[in-house]
């Protein structure tokens, strides 16, 4: 009977019907779709029915071929088949599906959940010497501080800092501000001689043992240098006094150029109330440019009631 069907298929020109493969042979057994562990497999589709027979052919021809390569070739060949050539395998897959439903009515497809892999480990941070620490750039140092530390380090060793460090720091800050904004008159009053002397002392090293050692190592200054320093200090003090006097004269000249106030402005009424006077002794009503005649009349009038009886309401 099988031979007759094969001959009829050859006459029709279609592919030969699938022979009794392992699927049909296993379907005759009672546990044909069960694994030894008790898991029920899904029924095969048309491609799986066709690929079983074709896979055996390929394995016979190329026994060393990898399973992944065999599956790739089978997929390409299945896509090249026409729909008429797939009909016998589709029918066989439908028969197996109905048999599977009859043998395992309570079967429900439960796909295996993919196990979530371990969370990605955090990227290890490089050591501080070669990692982010190298990207940090040191801030700009003020001129004078770095030199003082560099010069005082080898001479003083581990000696304590002098007590007048705060004063030296203030002088250095004033010097830096003078360099950045030379247009400010106030910052030009820095004693240049004192600052120069402080820098010279810092260059020699801190007080204590380091200073004594430095003084012993260096030659004693001559007597001619002391008068020169005193002359520099005196010249700097005279320049500061001249600048102070000049700034005072400018302020007095500015006040002298102000226009005189009108004679009609009378603020005697405001003087009677001490609460209206600001703590600095001046009043915002003393600027005549912003007072009109109407405002002057209002200010000159008596604001307070003449007696307490005016504050009592009678019905």
Curated annotation (Swiss-Prot):
Role according to the record: Transcription factor that binds to DNA at the consensus sequence 5'-ACCAAAG-3'. Acts as a transcriptional activator. Binds cooperatively with POU3F2/BRN2 or POU3F1/OCT6 to gene promoters, which enhances transcriptional activation. Involved in the differentiation of naive CD4-positive T-cells into peripherally induced regulatory T (pT reg) cells under inflammatory conditions. Binds to the promoter region of the FOXP3 gene and promotes its transcription, and might thereby contribute to pT reg cell differentiation in the spleen and lymph nodes during inflammation.
Location(s), subcellular: Nucleus
Ranges of biased composition (kind: Gly residues): 149-159
Region (Required for transcriptional activation activity and synergistic coactivation of transcriptional activity with POU3F2): 283-315
Keywords, alphabetical: Activator, DNA-binding, Nucleus, Transcription, Transcription regulation
Main location: nucleus
Biased composition range(s): Acidic residues: 162-173, 222-244
DNA-binding annotation, residue ranges on this chain: 40-108
GO MF annotation list: DNA binding; DNA-binding transcription activator activity, RNA polymerase II-specific; DNA-binding transcription factor activity, RNA polymerase II-specific; RNA polymerase II cis-regulatory region sequence-specific DNA binding; sequence-specific double-stranded DNA binding; transcription cis-regulatory region binding
Tagged with keyword Ligase: no
GO biological process terms held by the UniProt record: brain development; camera-type eye morphogenesis; negative regulation of transcription by RNA polymerase II; neuron differentiation; positive regulation of regulatory T cell differentiation; positive regulation of transcription by RNA polymerase II; spinal cord development
Tree of life domain: Eukaryota
InterPro entries xref list: HMG_box_dom, HMG_box_dom_sf, SOX-12/11/4, SRY-related_HMG-box_TF-like
Entry-linked SUPFAM superfamilies: HMG-box
Coiled coil: none
Ranges of compositional bias, category Low complexity: 192-221
Region feature Disordered, mapped onto this chain: 1-40, 100-288
Tissue spec: Expressed most abundantly in the CNS. Expressed in the heart, pancreas, thymus, testis and ovary. Weakly expressed in brain, placenta, lung, liver, skeletal muscle, kidney, spleen, prostate, small intestine, colon, and peripheral blood lymphocytes.
Biased composition (Basic and acidic residues): 100-109, 174-187
GO cellular component, one term: nucleoplasm
PANTHER family: SOX TRANSCRIPTION FACTOR (PTHR10270), TRANSCRIPTION FACTOR SOX-12 (PTHR10270:SF221)
Lineage, broadest ranks: Eukaryota, Metazoa, Chordata, Craniata, Vertebrata
Protein name: Transcription factor SOX-12
Keyword Kinase: no
């Amino acid at each position: 009977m099988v031979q007759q069907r094969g001959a009829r298929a050859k006459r029709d020109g279609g592919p030969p019907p699938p022979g009794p493969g392992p699927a049909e042979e296993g379907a005759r057994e009672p546990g044909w779709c069960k694994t030894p562990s008790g898991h029920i497999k899904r029924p095969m589709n048309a491609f799986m029915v066709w690929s079983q027979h074709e896979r055996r052919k390929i394995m016979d021809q190329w026994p060393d071929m990898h399973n992944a390569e065999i599956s790739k070739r089978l997929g390409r060949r299945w896509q090249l088949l026409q729909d008429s050539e797939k009909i016998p395998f589709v029918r066989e897959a439908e028969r197996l599906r109905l048999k599977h439903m009859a043998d395992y009515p309570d079967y429900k497809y439960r796909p295996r959940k993919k196990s979530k892999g371990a969370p990605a480990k955090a990227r290890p941070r490089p050591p501080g010497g070669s990692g982010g620490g190298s990207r940090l750039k040191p801030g700009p140092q003020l001129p004078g501080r770095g030199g003082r530390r560099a010069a005082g380090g080898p001479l003083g060793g581990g000696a304590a800092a002098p007590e007048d460090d705060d004063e030296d720091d203030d002088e250095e800050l004033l010097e830096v501000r003078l360099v950045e904004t030379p247009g400010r008159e106030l910052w030009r009053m820095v004693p240049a001689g004192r600052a120069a002397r402080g820098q010279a002392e810092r260059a020699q090293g801190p007080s204590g043992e380091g200073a004594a050692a430095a003084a012993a190592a260096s030659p004693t200054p001559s007597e001619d240098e002391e008068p020169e320093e005193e002359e520099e200090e005196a010249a700097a003090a005279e320049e500061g006094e001249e600048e102070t006097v000049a700034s005072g004269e400018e302020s007095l000249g500015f006040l002298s150029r102000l226009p005189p106030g009108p004679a009609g402005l009378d603020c005697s009424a405001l003087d009677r109330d001490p609460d209206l006077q600001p703590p600095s002794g001046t009043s915002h009503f003393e600027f005549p440019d912003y007072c009109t005649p109407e405002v002057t009349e209002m200010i000159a009038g008596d604001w307070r009631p003449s007696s307490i009886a005016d504050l009592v309401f009678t019905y």
